[in-house]
């Protein structure tokens, strides 16, 4: 009996040592990154996320990924990434920061895009990833403020005044800047939206709050003011009719990746304002900050 017990213990120890050796030799210590994220949206049109460890001044890819409809980390083919663990062929323990970027479809190079989404400095091999990190957007947008009016300056008629949304301030009697937003880093743009009967319709993308945005897809023939906004007069999307009445809808400012993976609003929406059901034209209405649900994450080098 003693001999049998000794043999059994020896065999068990041998199996444990073999398993330990297999785990160690499979991925050496310091070459794995465990990611956990919340609030990310699935990217469309082949766009995807990619992790980077910043070693010195060199970005080292820790792997490409997307998230599913439940926010779980998945491969580019949709398979689950067990434990959010990515294996690399580099020792990551000398990294100073972890950065998550948004990469375009077909990306094969070894460099990150300018669209840095989440990031965080590493300390003791771990990092908290936020939008506000200096390596990401560099601002948490909690100080953002906004105002808007309903008006249709691009038409001569006065019967459609509630069919235009402009991010400006008329409280002084003269048009003034209605948005207070930080300057975005490369790879990002702001975009205005009017939610009409539950449908988000873009007013255009912009980077300056005191200049016209980049398009007037739905506006009338006259010139608009030098501020972001749109009149909804022509070329209504399917299911909508222009001119319309924006009262009872919502005005939104989003932050969009550039280039963008989708024509729909992105997750980052720092400002929103309900348009009263009894809204009057040429009256200034406020927007409120909406940053509590911004994505977050953590990264641990193993």
Where are these regions (language model features)?
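Detector for methionine-enriched segments
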Residues: 1-2, 16, 32, 287
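Bacterial N-terminal signal peptides that target proteins for export
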Residues: 1-9
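Hydrophobic alpha-helical segments
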Residues: 8-11, 48
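Bacterial N-terminal signal peptides
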Residues: 10-18
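N-terminal targeting/export leaders
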Residues: 21-302
């Amino acid at each position: 009996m003693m001999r049998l017990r000794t043999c059994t213990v020896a065999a068990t120890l041998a199996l444990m040592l073999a398993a330990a050796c297999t785990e160690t030799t499979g991925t050496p210590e310091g070459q794995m990154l465990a990611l956990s994220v919340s609030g990310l949206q699935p990217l469309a049109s082949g766009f995807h996320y990619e992790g980077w460890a910043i070693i010195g001044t060199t970005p080292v890819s820790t792997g490409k990924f997307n998230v599913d409809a439940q926010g779980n980390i998945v491969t580019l083919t949709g398979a689950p990434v067990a434990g959010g663990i990515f294996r690399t062929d580099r020792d990551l323990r000398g990294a100073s920061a972890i950065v998550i970027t948004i990469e375009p479809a077909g990306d094969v190079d070894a460099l990150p895009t300018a669209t840095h989404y989440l990031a965080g400095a590493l300390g003791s091999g771990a990092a908290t990833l936020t939008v506000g990190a200096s390596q990401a957007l560099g601002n948490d947008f909690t100080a953002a403020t906004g105002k808007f009016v309903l008006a249709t300056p691009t038409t001569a008629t006065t019967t459609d005044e509630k069919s235009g949304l402009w991010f400006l301030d008329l409280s002084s009697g003269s048009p003034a800047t209605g948005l207070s937003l930080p300057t975005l880093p490369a790879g990002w743009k702001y975009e205005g939206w009017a939610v009409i009967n539950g449908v988000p319709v873009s007013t255009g993308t912009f980077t300056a709050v005191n200049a016209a945005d980049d398009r007037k897809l739905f506006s009338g023939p006259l010139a608009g003011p030098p501020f972001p906004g749109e009149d909804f007069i022509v070329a209504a999307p399917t299911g909508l009719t222009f001119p319309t009445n924006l009262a009872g809808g919502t005005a939104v400012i989003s932050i969009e990746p550039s280039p963008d993976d989708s024509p729909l609003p992105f997750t980052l929406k720092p400002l929103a304002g309900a348009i009263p059901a009894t809204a009057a034209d040429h009256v200034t209405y406020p927007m409120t900050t909406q940053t509590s649900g911004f994505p977050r994450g953590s990264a641990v080098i193993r």
